[in-house]
Amino acid sequence: MSQFPIHTIETAPEAAKEALKAVQNANGFIPNLIGVLANAPTALETYRTVGGINGRNSLTAVEREVVQITAAVVNGCGFCVAGHTKIALKLLKLEEALVNQIRSTARIEQDAKLDALARFTLTVILQKAKLTQAQQQAFYDAGYTKENALDVVLGVSLATLCNYANNLADTPINPELQLFA
């Protein structure tokens, strides 16, 4: 059971109602994360704004999901693991074996570049972005740029907002996402 109210369009603070309507229209349901964030309309606005910016960063859609899933796993957020697994499998059509490797933080054997991204993301989180020159160089040697490195930090910051909000609230996973938990 959630430690925070999970708002609907009807119960949300006035400042969050339009955002919830937009999410409902876009997804066909309101993810419980959004209902939780509606308790703080500025947190919900931040999520939507930063999410939009993250969606147009220098990483590909697949690479952004690697960052999001890796962060969710490291931060212990089952809700976000499920949500981003659904995106990876259903929207991006990634192979289940690849998604399972990302979720397990194991080596991504079939794609060295994505593996370098996952390792970099993991290291950014665990070392609070205090990477050695060799750790950074391994990322660049895989074909990534300094812009990509900063966009990983952007993705991790978005994930941290979501993961921590879900962990704080003990957000239950929506039925629409249960299959991907």
Positions of the model-derived regions?
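Hydrophobic alpha-helical segments
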Residues: 1-181
